[in-house]
C-alpha cells in the first residue's frame, strides 16, 4: 500500500513538473515574441524619426580610379609628404592624379608643378579668397562678358557657357580692372572645386572633376584682340594651366565661321590627338550635336534647348545646377561630395575577395592549384611603393621616349593645361594664326608623320649606330631646351607692331563709320526716290483721268 501511494505521488509530481515545463516554454515563447515586436517597433519608429528629422541622406560615390593610377598617386603622395608639400586640404588622390596626368606621369615634373601651385596659392591668398574677396561689379561684368554655368550634361558634368561674340572688352575694363577680374576668376574656380563639382558628384553618384564648355564665337572679330584683352587672357591662361590642370572634359566651339574652321583644320594636325579629341569646332548647325551630350531641359533655349530660366533673369544669370539644391548643398558642407582617400589596401583587398569568390565555385583541386600558381601575383597590403624607382613601367630604358622627342612641337600638352574660359579660346585663335604663319611652307604630311609617328610606306630602313643615335638625342634635347626657353618668354608686341595694330584698328573703325554714314545716305536717297516715284505715279493717274 505504501508502495502504491508513493508511486501515485511520483506520477503526480512528474505531471506537475511536465506542466511547469510546458508553462515555462509558453511563457518564454510569448516573451520572445513580445521582445521581437518591441524591437521591430523601435526600429521602425527610429527609422521614421530619422528620416523625418534629417532629410539629408548619405550617398555612395563611385570612384573609377584604377590600381595603376592609384600606385602612381601613392608614390607621388609619398614624395610630397617627404618634402612637406602636402597640406591636409589638398590630400586628395584625384587632385594629385590631375597633376600627374598633366605631366604625363613624370614624377619630378608633376612635383615641380605641385610646388609652384602651393607657393602661388600662398602668395595669391587663394585659401581665403572666397571669404575675403567681394566682387561687387559682378552684374556689370556679366553684362559686358556673358558667361556662367547652366545645368549639367548627360554624364553629370557641369556645363559652362560663354558668348564671346557679345564681349565688349573696352566697357569691361571700364567697370573693373584686370587684377580684380583675375581674382574673381580664381574665386569662381575655387567655388567650382569646393561646391559645384562635389554637388555634381553627389547628384550623379560618381566622382566628377571636369566640365563641359560651350563657346559661342559668333561675332568675334579683331576688336576682341585689344591690348587689354590680350593681357587678361594671358594671365588667366597661365593661372589655369599651371594651377588647375585637366579640368576640361570637352569643348564645343559653335557658330564658327569658315575662316575659323579653316585655321582649325590646318592647325589640328600639329596638336596632340588627346587635346584635339576634346575640342569640337561646329558651324551654325550645332543643335543636334549639343543635344546628344546635354538634355534639352538643361540646355538654354538660345542654344537649341527648352530652358529659359525666365524667373531668374535668363539662363546666363541663373547659375542653374544641383549645387542649388538645399539637401545636396548641406551634404557638400558636410564633406560628403568628395571620395574618401583610397589606399592600395582598399583595391588589393577587393581584388583578393574577388579571387576568393571565383575560386569558391570551382572544385577543391582546382582551388588549390589556383592558389599555388597565383600566390605570387597577389599584391601585399603592407607593401609600400618606392618613389625613387617609380614608375618603372613608364621608362623602359635610359633613352628618351619618342613622345619626349617631340614635346617641343606640342608645348600646349607639355604645359598640361586646357585653357579655361575666354583666355583659353582667345589664346587658341591667336596660336592658330601664329602657327599657320610660321608653318605655311612646311609639308603637312611630313609634319604629321613626324608628330604622330604614323605608319607610312615602309621602305628599307638603314641601321643607325649608337653614336649617331646619341648625337641625335643630344641635338633634340638642345632644341627642346631652346624651345622651352622661348616658350617661357612673355609674349609681347614691339612698339612698332603695336602702333601698326592700333592704326589698323583705327582704320577699321573709320571704315565702319563711313560705311554707316554711306548706308544712312543711301537709305535717305531711297526714301526720296520712293516719294518722287509716288508723285510721278500720281501725276500719271491724274493726266489719264482728265484725258490730256
Curated annotation (Swiss-Prot):
Biased composition (Basic and acidic residues): 8-20
PROSITE patterns assigned: CRAL_TRIO
Superkingdom of source: Eukaryota
Subcellular location(s) per record: Golgi apparatus membrane; Cell membrane
Region (Disordered): 1-20
Pfam families tied to this protein: CRAL_TRIO, CRAL_TRIO_N
Organ and tissue specificity: Predominantly expressed in flowers but also slightly detected in stems and immature siliques.
Coiled coil: 465-530
CC annotations in GO: Golgi membrane; plasma membrane
Gene Ontology biological process: flower development; protein transport
Family statement: Belongs to the SFH family.
Record's protein name: Phosphatidylinositol/phosphatidylcholine transfer protein SFH3
Native organism: Arabidopsis thaliana (Mouse-ear cress)
Amino acid at each position: 500500500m505504501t508502495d502504491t501511494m508513493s508511486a501515485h505521488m511520483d506520477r503526480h509530481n512528474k505531471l506537475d513538473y511536465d506542466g511547469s515545463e510546458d508553462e515555462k516554454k509558453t511563457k518564454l515563447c510569448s516573451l520572445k515574441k513580445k521582445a521581437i515586436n518591441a524591437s521591430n517597433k523601435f526600429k521602425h519608429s527610429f527609422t521614421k524619426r530619422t528620416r523625418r528629422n534629417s532629410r539629408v541622406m548619405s550617398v555612395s560615390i563611385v570612384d573609377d580610379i584604377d590600381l595603376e593610377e592609384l600606385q602612381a598617386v601613392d608614390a607621388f603622395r609619398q614624395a610630397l609628404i617627404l618634402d612637406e608639400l602636402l597640406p591636409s586640404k589638398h590630400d586628395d588622390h584625384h587632385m594629385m592624379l590631375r597633376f600627374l596626368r598633366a605631366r604625363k606621369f613624370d614624377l619630378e615634373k608633376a612635383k615641380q608643378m605641385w610646388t609652384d601651385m602651393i607657393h602661388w596659392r600662398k602668395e595669391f591668398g587663394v585659401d581665403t579668397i572666397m571669404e575675403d574677396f567681394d566682387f561687387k561689379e559682378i552684374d556689370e561684368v556679366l553684362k559686358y562678358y556673358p558667361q556662367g554655368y547652366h545645368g549639367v550634361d548627360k554624364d553629370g558634368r557641369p556645363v559652362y557657357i560663354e558668348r564671346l561674340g557679345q564681349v565688349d572688352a573696352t566697357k569691361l575694363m571700364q567697370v573693373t580692372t584686370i587684377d580684380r577680374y583675375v581674382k574673381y576668376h580664381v574665386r569662381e574656380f575655387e567655388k567650382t572645386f569646393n561646391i559645384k563639382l562635389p554637388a555634381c558628384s553627389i547628384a550623379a553618384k560618381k566622382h566628377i572633376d571636369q566640365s563641359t564648355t560651350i563657346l559661342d564665337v559668333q561675332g568675334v572679330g579683331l576688336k576682341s584682340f585689344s591690348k587689354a584683352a590680350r593681357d587678361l587672357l594671358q594671365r588667366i591662361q597661365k593661372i589655369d594651366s599651371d594651377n588647375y590642370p585637366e579640368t576640361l572634359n570637352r569643348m564645343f566651339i559653335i557658330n564658327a565661321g569658315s575662316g575659323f574652321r579653316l585655321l582649325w583644320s590646318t592647325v589640328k594636325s600639329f596638336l596632340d590627338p588627346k587635346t584635339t579629341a576634346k575640342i569640337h569646332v561646329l558651324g551654325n548647325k550645332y543643335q543636334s550635336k549639343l543635344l546628344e551630350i546635354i538634355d534639352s531641359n538643361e540646355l538654354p533655349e538660345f542654344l537649341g534647348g527648352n530652358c529659359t530660366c525666365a524667373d531668374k533673369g535668363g539662363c546666363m544669370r541663373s547659375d542653374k545646377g544641383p549645387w542649388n539644391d538645399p539637401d545636396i548643398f548641406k551634404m557638400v558642407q558636410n564633406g560628403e561630395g568628395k571620395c574618401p582617400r583610397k589606399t592600395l589596401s582598399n583595391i588589393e583587398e577587393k581584388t583578393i575577395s574577388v579571387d576568393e569568390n571565383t575560386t569558391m565555385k570551382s572544385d577543391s583541386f582546382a582551388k588549390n592549384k589556383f592558389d599555388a600558381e597565383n600566390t605570387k601575383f597577389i599584391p601585399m597590403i603592407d607593401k609600400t611603393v618606392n618613389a625613387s624607382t617609380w614608375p618603372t613601367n613608364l621608362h623602359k630604358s635610359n633613352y628618351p621616349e619618342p613622345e619626349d622627342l617631340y614635346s617641343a612641337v606640342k608645348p600646349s600638352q607639355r604645359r598640361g593645361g586646357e585653357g579655361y574660359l575666354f583666355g583659353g579660346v582667345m589664346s587658341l585663335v591667336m596660336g592658330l594664326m601664329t602657327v599657320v604663319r610660321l608653318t605655311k611652307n612646311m609639308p603637312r604630311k611630313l609634319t604629321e608623320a613626324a608628330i604622330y609617328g604614323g605608319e607610312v610606306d615602309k621602305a628599307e630602313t638603314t641601321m643607325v649606330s649608337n653614336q649617331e643615335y646619341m648625337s641625335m638625342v643630344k641635338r633634340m634635347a638642345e632644341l627642346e631646351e631652346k624651345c622651352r626657353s622661348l616658350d617661357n618668354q612673355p609674349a609681347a608686341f614691339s612698339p612698332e607692331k603695336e602702333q601698326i595694330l592700333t592704326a589698323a584698328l583705327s582704320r577699321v573703325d573709320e571704315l565702319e563709320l563711313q560705311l554707316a554714314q554711306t548706308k544712312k545716305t543711301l537709305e535717305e536717297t531711297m526714301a526720296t526716290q520712293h516719294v518722287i516715284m509716288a508723285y510721278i505715279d500720281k501725276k500719271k493717274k491724274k493726266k489719264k483721268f482728265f484725258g490730256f
